[in-house]
Protein backbone atom coordinates (compact mmCIF):
# COMPACT_ATOMS: atom_id res chain seq x y z
CA UNK A 1 0.00 0.00 0.00
CA UNK A 2 2.80 2.36 0.96
CA UNK A 3 4.54 1.57 -2.31
CA UNK A 4 1.39 2.48 -4.31
CA UNK A 5 1.07 5.81 -2.47
CA UNK A 6 4.74 6.56 -3.12
CA UNK A 7 4.35 5.75 -6.82
CA UNK A 8 1.28 8.02 -7.07
CA UNK A 9 3.14 10.83 -5.32
CA UNK A 10 6.09 10.42 -7.67
CA UNK A 11 3.74 10.42 -10.68
CA UNK A 12 2.07 13.63 -9.51
CA UNK A 13 5.47 15.31 -9.09
CA UNK A 14 6.49 14.10 -12.55
CA UNK A 15 3.22 15.41 -14.04
CA UNK A 16 3.72 18.77 -12.34
CA UNK A 17 7.21 19.01 -13.82
CA UNK A 18 5.89 18.21 -17.29
CA UNK A 19 3.13 20.85 -17.00
CA UNK A 20 5.66 23.37 -15.73
CA UNK A 21 7.96 22.62 -18.65
CA UNK A 22 5.09 23.00 -21.13
CA UNK A 23 4.10 26.33 -19.54
CA UNK A 24 7.67 27.60 -19.77
CA UNK A 25 7.86 26.51 -23.40
CA UNK A 26 4.62 28.33 -24.25
CA UNK A 27 5.87 31.41 -22.42
CA UNK A 28 9.18 31.26 -24.27
CA UNK A 29 7.45 31.03 -27.64
CA UNK A 30 5.18 33.95 -26.71
CA UNK A 31 8.15 35.98 -25.54
CA UNK A 32 9.92 35.35 -28.86
CA UNK A 33 6.90 36.57 -30.84
CA UNK A 34 7.88 39.85 -32.47
CA UNK A 35 6.09 42.15 -34.84
CA UNK A 36 8.26 43.24 -37.74
CA UNK A 37 7.56 45.86 -40.37
CA UNK A 38 6.63 44.40 -43.75
CA UNK A 39 6.00 47.68 -45.56
CA UNK A 40 5.61 51.40 -44.86
CA UNK A 41 4.04 54.17 -46.92
CA UNK A 42 4.28 57.75 -45.69
CA UNK A 43 2.98 61.16 -46.68
CA UNK A 44 3.45 64.64 -45.23
CA UNK A 45 0.43 66.80 -44.48
CA UNK A 46 0.02 70.29 -43.11
CA UNK A 47 2.01 71.64 -40.12
CA UNK A 48 4.47 68.77 -40.29
CA UNK A 49 1.90 66.03 -39.63
CA UNK A 50 3.11 62.75 -41.11
CA UNK A 51 0.72 60.01 -42.18
CA UNK A 52 1.98 56.42 -42.29
CA UNK A 53 0.37 53.21 -43.44
CA UNK A 54 2.37 50.41 -41.84
CA UNK A 55 1.91 46.68 -42.38
CA UNK A 56 3.40 44.52 -39.63
CA UNK A 57 3.71 40.77 -39.23
CA UNK A 58 4.04 38.38 -36.30
CA UNK A 59 5.62 35.31 -37.90
CA UNK A 60 5.20 33.19 -34.76
CA UNK A 61 1.44 33.72 -34.63
CA UNK A 62 1.20 33.88 -38.44
CA UNK A 63 -0.69 37.17 -38.21
CA UNK A 64 -0.58 40.46 -40.10
CA UNK A 65 -2.00 43.84 -39.13
CA UNK A 66 -2.24 47.21 -40.83
CA UNK A 67 -1.89 50.51 -38.99
CA UNK A 68 -2.86 53.98 -40.19
CA UNK A 69 -1.02 56.50 -38.03
CA UNK A 70 -0.66 60.28 -37.86
CA UNK A 71 2.52 61.51 -36.14
CA UNK A 72 2.83 65.16 -35.15
CA UNK A 73 4.81 67.57 -33.00
CA UNK A 74 3.29 68.68 -29.71
CA UNK A 75 5.14 71.98 -30.20
CA UNK A 76 3.35 72.96 -33.41
CA UNK A 77 0.05 71.09 -32.94
CA UNK A 78 -2.62 70.80 -30.26
CA UNK A 79 -5.42 68.38 -29.44
CA UNK A 80 -9.13 69.09 -29.47
CA UNK A 81 -11.94 66.96 -28.10
CA UNK A 82 -14.95 67.55 -30.33
CA UNK A 83 -18.42 66.81 -29.02
CA UNK A 84 -20.69 64.99 -31.46
CA UNK A 85 -24.21 64.86 -29.98
CA UNK A 86 -25.84 64.53 -33.42
CA UNK A 87 -23.78 61.53 -34.51
CA UNK A 88 -22.04 63.29 -37.39
CA UNK A 89 -19.35 61.43 -39.36
CA UNK A 90 -15.66 61.99 -38.65
CA UNK A 91 -14.84 63.52 -42.06
CA UNK A 92 -17.51 66.21 -41.79
CA UNK A 93 -16.45 67.13 -38.26
CA UNK A 94 -12.74 67.29 -39.16
CA UNK A 95 -13.37 69.56 -42.15
CA UNK A 96 -15.68 71.86 -40.21
CA UNK A 97 -13.23 72.21 -37.32
CA UNK A 98 -10.26 72.65 -39.70
CA UNK A 99 -8.36 69.72 -38.22
CA UNK A 100 -5.14 68.27 -39.59
CA UNK A 101 -6.03 64.70 -38.60
CA UNK A 102 -8.30 62.92 -36.17
CA UNK A 103 -9.85 59.73 -34.85
CA UNK A 104 -12.96 58.64 -32.98
CA UNK A 105 -12.91 59.33 -29.25
CA UNK A 106 -13.96 57.69 -26.01
CA UNK A 107 -16.65 55.32 -24.84
CA UNK A 108 -20.34 56.16 -24.52
CA UNK A 109 -23.37 54.44 -23.00
CA UNK A 110 -26.58 53.21 -24.73
CA UNK A 111 -28.09 56.67 -24.19
CA UNK A 112 -25.19 58.20 -26.19
CA UNK A 113 -23.70 59.85 -23.10
CA UNK A 114 -19.90 59.89 -22.67
CA UNK A 115 -18.37 57.49 -20.16
CA UNK A 116 -15.57 58.97 -18.08
CA UNK A 117 -13.85 62.34 -18.11
CA UNK A 118 -14.35 64.62 -21.07
CA UNK A 119 -13.12 68.21 -21.35
CA UNK A 120 -13.60 70.26 -24.50
CA UNK A 121 -12.33 73.85 -24.83
CA UNK A 122 -11.65 73.89 -21.03
CA UNK A 123 -15.28 72.96 -20.28
CA UNK A 124 -15.93 69.64 -18.51
CA UNK A 125 -19.06 67.72 -19.49
CA UNK A 126 -18.40 64.52 -17.52
CA UNK A 127 -16.17 63.54 -14.62
CA UNK A 128 -13.39 61.01 -14.05
CA UNK A 129 -14.74 57.50 -13.56
CA UNK A 130 -12.86 54.81 -11.68
CA UNK A 131 -13.20 51.59 -13.65
CA UNK A 132 -10.95 48.72 -14.67
CA UNK A 133 -11.24 49.35 -18.40
CA UNK A 134 -10.89 53.14 -18.63
CA UNK A 135 -7.55 53.58 -16.89
CA UNK A 136 -6.05 56.29 -19.10
CA UNK A 137 -6.60 59.96 -19.89
CA UNK A 138 -5.41 61.78 -23.00
CA UNK A 139 -5.08 65.49 -22.32
CA UNK A 140 -3.96 68.81 -23.74
CA UNK A 141 -2.79 71.40 -21.24
CA UNK A 142 -0.73 74.56 -21.46
CA UNK A 143 2.27 72.30 -20.86
CA UNK A 144 1.55 70.16 -23.92
CA UNK A 145 0.06 66.77 -24.78
CA UNK A 146 0.16 63.86 -22.36
CA UNK A 147 -1.24 60.39 -21.73
CA UNK A 148 -1.64 59.73 -18.01
CA UNK A 149 -3.18 57.23 -15.64
CA UNK A 150 -6.65 58.18 -14.45
CA UNK A 151 -5.28 58.03 -10.90
CA UNK A 152 -2.72 60.72 -11.82
CA UNK A 153 -5.30 63.26 -12.98
CA UNK A 154 -5.36 66.56 -11.11
CA UNK A 155 -7.32 69.76 -11.53
CA UNK A 156 -4.36 71.85 -10.37
CA UNK A 157 -3.22 72.51 -13.93
CA UNK A 158 -5.40 74.11 -16.57
CA UNK A 159 -6.71 71.41 -18.89
CA UNK A 160 -7.79 72.53 -22.34
CA UNK A 161 -8.97 69.14 -23.62
CA UNK A 162 -9.14 65.66 -22.13
CA UNK A 163 -10.78 62.33 -22.77
CA UNK A 164 -10.79 59.22 -20.60
CA UNK A 165 -10.57 55.77 -22.17
CA UNK A 166 -8.39 52.71 -21.98
CA UNK A 167 -6.96 50.36 -21.19
CA UNK A 168 -3.36 51.56 -20.98
CA UNK A 169 -1.24 49.86 -23.66
CA UNK A 170 2.30 51.16 -23.23
CA UNK A 171 4.13 52.69 -20.27
CA UNK A 172 7.84 53.60 -20.12
CA UNK A 173 8.10 52.29 -23.69
CA UNK A 174 7.07 48.78 -22.59
CA UNK A 175 3.82 46.96 -23.31
CA UNK A 176 1.45 46.51 -20.39
CA UNK A 177 1.25 42.93 -19.14
CA UNK A 178 -2.00 41.04 -18.69
CA UNK A 179 -3.89 42.53 -21.64
CA UNK A 180 -6.32 40.32 -23.56
CA UNK A 181 -4.47 38.42 -26.29
CA UNK A 182 -7.32 36.48 -27.89
CA UNK A 183 -10.09 38.91 -28.86
CA UNK A 184 -9.34 40.46 -32.25
CA UNK A 185 -10.98 43.75 -33.24
CA UNK A 186 -10.33 47.05 -34.96
CA UNK A 187 -8.56 49.35 -32.52
CA UNK A 188 -8.09 53.10 -32.14
CA UNK A 189 -5.15 54.39 -30.12
CA UNK A 190 -3.27 57.51 -29.04
CA UNK A 191 0.22 57.89 -27.65
CA UNK A 192 3.08 60.18 -26.79
CA UNK A 193 6.56 59.56 -28.13
CA UNK A 194 10.13 60.76 -27.84
CA UNK A 195 11.22 64.20 -29.10
CA UNK A 196 7.96 65.82 -27.97
CA UNK A 197 5.84 64.02 -30.53
CA UNK A 198 2.43 62.41 -30.32
CA UNK A 199 0.53 59.99 -32.49
CA UNK A 200 -2.98 58.74 -33.10
CA UNK A 201 -4.22 56.01 -35.34
CA UNK A 202 -6.20 52.87 -36.02
CA UNK A 203 -5.18 49.24 -36.42
CA UNK A 204 -6.87 46.37 -38.24
CA UNK A 205 -8.02 43.26 -36.38
CA UNK A 206 -5.62 42.75 -33.49
CA UNK A 207 -5.82 41.95 -29.78
CA UNK A 208 -5.10 44.54 -27.10
CA UNK A 209 -1.91 42.68 -26.21
CA UNK A 210 -0.92 42.57 -29.86
CA UNK A 211 -1.47 46.30 -30.30
CA UNK A 212 0.54 47.04 -27.16
CA UNK A 213 3.42 44.93 -28.49
CA UNK A 214 3.27 46.65 -31.86
CA UNK A 215 3.33 50.15 -30.38
CA UNK A 216 6.17 49.34 -27.99
CA UNK A 217 8.43 47.67 -30.56
CA UNK A 218 7.70 48.96 -34.07
CA UNK A 219 9.73 52.09 -35.00
CA UNK A 220 7.44 54.57 -36.73
CA UNK A 221 10.50 56.79 -37.27
CA UNK A 222 14.19 56.57 -36.45
CA UNK A 223 13.83 58.97 -33.53
CA UNK A 224 10.22 58.29 -32.54
CA UNK A 225 9.80 55.75 -29.73
CA UNK A 226 6.37 55.45 -28.12
CA UNK A 227 6.63 56.19 -24.39
CA UNK A 228 2.98 55.91 -23.35
CA UNK A 229 -0.11 54.81 -25.25
CA UNK A 230 -3.72 53.99 -24.53
CA UNK A 231 -6.67 52.44 -26.28
CA UNK A 232 -9.71 54.47 -27.38
CA UNK A 233 -13.12 53.14 -28.36
CA UNK A 234 -12.66 50.57 -31.13
CA UNK A 235 -14.50 47.98 -33.15
CA UNK A 236 -17.23 49.54 -35.26
CA UNK A 237 -16.43 52.95 -33.70
CA UNK A 238 -12.88 53.05 -35.11
CA UNK A 239 -12.34 55.86 -37.61
CA UNK A 240 -9.34 57.80 -38.97
CA UNK A 241 -8.93 60.98 -41.01
CA UNK A 242 -5.89 62.80 -42.44
CA UNK A 243 -5.79 66.07 -44.42
CA UNK A 244 -3.46 65.91 -47.41
CA UNK A 245 -1.43 68.91 -48.58
CA UNK A 246 -3.34 69.05 -51.88
CA UNK A 247 -6.64 69.69 -50.11
CA UNK A 248 -8.00 66.15 -50.32
CA UNK A 249 -8.21 63.77 -47.38
CA UNK A 250 -7.57 60.14 -46.57
CA UNK A 251 -10.41 58.69 -44.51
CA UNK A 252 -11.35 55.42 -42.84
CA UNK A 253 -14.97 55.93 -41.76
CA UNK A 254 -16.49 54.42 -38.66
CA UNK A 255 -19.33 51.94 -38.95
CA UNK A 256 -21.57 53.64 -36.39
CA UNK A 257 -22.09 57.12 -34.89
CA UNK A 258 -19.82 58.04 -31.97
CA UNK A 259 -20.23 60.63 -29.25
CA UNK A 260 -16.93 62.50 -29.70
CA UNK A 261 -13.75 62.83 -31.73
CA UNK A 262 -10.10 63.60 -31.01
CA UNK A 263 -8.79 66.11 -33.54
CA UNK A 264 -5.40 67.73 -34.11
CA UNK A 265 -5.14 71.42 -35.02
CA UNK A 266 -2.25 73.73 -35.79
CA UNK A 267 -1.22 76.07 -32.96
What label would you give each PLM region?
Residues 5-19:
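Bacterial N-terminal signal peptides that target proteins for export
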Residues 19-28:
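Bacterial N-terminal signal peptides
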Residues 32-129:
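Zymogen propeptides
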Residues 33-60, 175, 244-267:
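Flexible, D/E/H-enriched segments
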Residues 73-75, 139-144, 171-172, 192-196, ...:
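Short acidic-glycine loop/turn motifs at beta-strand connectors
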Residues 90-92, 156-161, 188-189, 209-214:
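A short, polar/proline- and glycine-enriched secondary-structure boundary/capping micro-motif
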Residues 108-181:
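Active-site-adjacent helix-turn-beta-strand microarchitecture at beta-sheet edges
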Residues 112-132, 180-188, 192-231, 236-267:
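Conserved, well-ordered active-site substructure
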Amino acid sequence: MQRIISERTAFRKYSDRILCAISLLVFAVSAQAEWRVVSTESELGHAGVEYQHVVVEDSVADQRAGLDVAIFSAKSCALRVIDNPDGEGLSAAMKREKCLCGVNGGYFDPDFKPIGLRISDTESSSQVRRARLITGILLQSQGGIDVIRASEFSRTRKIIAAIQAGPFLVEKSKSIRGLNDSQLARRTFVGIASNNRALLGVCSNVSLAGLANILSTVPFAADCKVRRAMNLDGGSSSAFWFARENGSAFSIPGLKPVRDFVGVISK
